[in-house]
C-alpha cells in the first residue's frame, strides 16, 4: 500500500464519515470570522434558534472594512465613515457578544487581518482543519494545516455543527529546488509558480509546496506562498511540519503549555508526506533561476521578471491568451514590449494578508537606506497585518525608517488590497502592491495593480518606477 501525502493524513484525521455520493463529513478545528461574510450566518442561527456548537473553536476580528488612518481608528467603530462598513463591523461586535464568541475588536492590540492573527496568536496549530469566509484561508496551510475558504452558508454550518460536507481534492506537489538568489523572496517564488502553471493549474487539487527552497523558507515566507495557492487555482496550499514550524508555534499565546507540549509536538510531527506517497501531479521548478517578479496585467499569471518586458502577442500560446493580453494592455495602459522598469507608478501599498508580517516590513525597510519616496509617488502606505506586528515593528524602529522616507505608517487592516474600505486607487493609477490579486478594479475602479514583493515595492517607491531590487 502506497504511503500517504500530507493532505491525505489531514483529511483522514478529520473525516467523520463518508457519504454515498463520494463526499465526506469533515470536522473543523478552527473557524475564523470577520465582518463581511458572517452577518447572514449569525442571522441564520438566530432564526433557527441554534447556538454555536463549540464556542472555543471560533475567533473573530474585523479586518476588511476597518479604517487604517490613525485618527479615524482612534474613534473605534464610530470612525468608520462608510455607513455599510460601519454597520458590518458593529454587527460583528453585536453578534459575537450575543453568541459569546471571542473577538479581537477594532482597537484591541491583537486585532488584525485574520490570516496574520491566527498563526501569530497560536490559534492555528499544525494538524488542524481551518476555515474562514475568505478565499485566502489557504495561508494557514503553511503550518501543516488543511485550510481553505468557505461561503456564508458554510459559515453558518460550521457555527451550528462544527462540520462541513466536502469532496476530496487531488494531490499536487510543487517542488522548488536549489537556493534563491539575493533579493528573491517567497513572493517572487509564488508569482513564478503561478506564471508557470497558470491560474487554473491547481484547479481541483490540494497543493503541497516542497523542495529545498521551502525547507529553507521562514514561516512568514511559507504563509505568503500558501496564501496565493488560490491564485494558482487550488483551494488548499500546504507545507509539511518541520523544525521551522515547531519553533514558530512554541510560546504563542494560545499554543499548548509546557505540560502539553511534548505530546502536541509528537503529534504535529506526523504531518508530512511519506517517502512513497503518490501525487496526481508533480511540478518542479529550479529556484536558482527565479528573479524578482512583477505582474504587468490583470491576472496573477500575467507576470514577468523585472528585467523583462510586457510580452508581445507573438509570445501568446493560443488565441484565448492573445485576447486576454489585448484586454490587459488596454486596461493597464501599457504597450506590448514595454520595459517593466519603464512603468511609472502613482501609489505604493505594502500590506495585506500576503505580505504584512514582521519579516515583510523588515525586508521593505532594509531597502530604504536613508532615501526618500520619489516625487511622482502620490501616496506610499505601510499597513501592518496586526496590532502585534505593528508594535513589534515600532519597537524595532521600522516605523521611523518608513515615515522619514515619506511613507505613511497605518493601523492594521486589509486596507488597499481590495476596494472595500477607504484605501483605494483612483482610475488609471498604477500601484506597486504586495497584495495577491490584480484583477480589474480590485484596488479601486479603474485602478491598475502590479503585484510585487515588499522589497520590490519599497524600491519602486524610492525610484518612482519599477527597478531591480538586486542592483538598486
Swiss-Prot record:
List the pathway annotation: Amino-acid biosynthesis; L-leucine biosynthesis; L-leucine from 3-methyl-2-oxobutanoate: step 2/4
Q: Which Pfam families match?
A: Aconitase (PF00330)
Q: Which reactions are catalysed by this chain?
A: (2R,3S)-3-isopropylmalate = (2S)-2-isopropylmalate
User: What EC number is given for this enzyme?
Assistant: 4.2.1.33
User: What CDD domains does this protein map onto?
Assistant: IPMI
**Necessary cofactors:** [4Fe-4S] cluster
**Which InterPro entries would you find in this protein's record?**
3-IsopropMal_deHydase_lsu, Acnase/IPM_dHydase_lsu_aba_1/3, Acoase/IPM_deHydtase_lsu_aba, Aconitase_4Fe-4S_BS, Aconitase_4Fe-4S_dom, IPM_dehydratase_rel_enz, IPMI_cat
- What is an annotated GO biological process for this record, any one? L-leucine biosynthetic process
Q: Which UniProt keywords apply?
A: 4Fe-4S, Amino-acid biosynthesis, Branched-chain amino acid biosynthesis, Iron, Iron-sulfur, Leucine biosynthesis, Lyase, Metal-binding
| Any one GO molecular-function label of the UniProt entry | 4 iron, 4 sulfur cluster binding
User: Which annotated residues bind [4Fe-4S] cluster?
Assistant: 353, 414, 417
**Record's cofactor remark:** Binds 1 [4Fe-4S] cluster per subunit.
Checking PROSITE patterns in the record gives: ACONITASE_1 (PS00450), ACONITASE_2 (PS01244)
What does the UniProt record say this protein does? Catalyzes the isomerization between 2-isopropylmalate and 3-isopropylmalate, via the formation of 2-isopropylmaleate.
Subunit and partners? Heterodimer of LeuC and LeuD.
Q: Which family does it belong to?
A: Belongs to the aconitase/IPM isomerase family. LeuC type 1 subfamily.
Name under which the protein is recorded: 3-isopropylmalate dehydratase large subunit
Give the gene symbol: leuC
Amino acid at each position: 500500500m502506497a504511503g500517504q501525502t500530507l493532505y491525505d493524513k489531514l483529511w483522514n484525521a478529520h473525516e467523520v464519515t463518508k457519504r454515498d455520493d463520494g463526499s465526506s463529513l469533515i470536522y473543523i478545528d478552527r473557524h475564523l470570522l470577520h465582518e463581511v461574510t458572517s452577518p447572514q450566518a449569525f442571522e441564520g442561527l438566530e432564526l433557527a434558534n441554534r447556538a454555536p456548537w463549540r464556542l472555543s473553536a471560533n475567533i473573530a476580528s474585523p479586518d476588511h472594512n476597518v479604517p487604517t488612518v490613525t485618527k479615524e481608528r482612534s474613534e473605534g467603530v464610530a470612525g468608520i465613515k462608510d455607513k455599510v462598513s460601519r454597520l458590518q463591523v458593529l454587527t460583528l461586535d453585536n453578534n459575537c457578544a450575543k453568541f459569546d464568541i471571542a473577538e479581537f475588536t477594532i482597537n484591541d492590540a491583537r486585532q488584525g487581518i485574520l490570516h496574520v492573527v491566527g498563526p501569530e496568536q497560536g490559534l492555528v496549530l499544525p494538524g488542524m482543519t481551518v476555515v474562514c469566509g475568505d478565499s485566502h484561508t489557504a495561508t494557514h496551510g503553511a503550518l501543516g494545516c488543511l485550510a481553505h475558504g468557505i461561503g456564508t452558508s458554510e459559515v453558518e454550518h460550521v457555527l451550528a455543527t462544527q462540520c462541513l460536507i466536502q469532496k476530496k481534492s487531488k494531490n499536487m506537489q510543487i517542488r522548488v529546488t536549489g537556493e534563491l538568489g539575493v533579493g528573491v523572496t517567497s513572493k517572487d517564488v509564488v508569482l513564478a509558480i503561478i506564471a508557470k502553471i497558470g491560474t487554473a493549474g491547481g484547479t481541483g487539487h490540494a497543493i503541497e509546496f516542497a523542495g529545498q527552497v521551502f525547507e529553507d523558507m521562514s514561516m512568514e515566507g511559507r504563509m505568503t506562498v500558501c496564501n496565493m495557492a488560490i491564485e494558482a487555482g487550488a483551494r488548499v496550499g500546504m507545507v509539511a511540519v518541520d523544525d521551522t514550524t515547531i519553533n514558530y508555534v512554541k510560546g504563542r499565546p494560545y499554543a499548548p503549555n509546557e505540560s502539553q507540549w511534548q505530546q502536541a509536538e509528537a503529534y504535529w510531527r506526523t504531518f508530512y508526506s511519506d517517502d512513497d506517497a503518490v501525487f496526481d501531479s508533480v511540478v518542479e521548478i529550479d529556484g536558482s533561476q527565479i528573479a524578482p517578479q512583477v505582474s504587468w496585467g490583470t491576472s496573477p499569471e500575467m507576470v514577468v521578471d523585472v528585467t523583462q518586458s510586457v510580452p508581445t502577442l507573438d509570445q501568446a500560446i493560443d488565441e484565448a491568451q492573445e485576447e486576454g493580453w489585448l484586454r490587459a494592455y488596454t486596461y493597464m495602459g501599457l504597450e506590448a514590449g514595454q520595459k517593466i522598469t519603464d512603468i511609472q507608478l502613482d501609489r505604493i501599498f505594502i500590506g495585506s494578508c500576503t505580505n504584512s508580517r514582521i519579516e515583510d516590513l523588515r525586508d521593505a525597510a532594509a531597502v530604504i537606506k536613508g532615501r526618500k519616496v520619489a516625487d511622482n509617488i502620490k501616496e506610499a502606505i505601510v499597513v501592518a497585518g496586526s496590532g502585534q506586528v505593528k508594535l513589534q515593528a515600532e519597537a524595532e524602529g521600522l516605523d521611523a525608517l518608513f515615515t522619514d522616507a515619506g511613507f505613511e505608517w497605518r493601523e492594521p487592516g486589509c486596507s488597499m488590497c481590495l476596494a472595500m474600505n477607504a484605501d483605494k486607487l483612483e482610475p488609471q493609477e498604477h500601484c506597486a502592491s504586495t497584495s495577491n490579486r490584480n484583477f480589474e478594479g480590485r484596488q479601486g475602479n479603474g485602478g491598475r495593480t502590479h503585484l510585487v514583493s515588499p522589497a520590490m515595492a519599497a524600491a519602486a517607491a524610492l525610484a518612482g518606477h519599477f527597478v531591480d531590487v538586486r542592483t538598486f
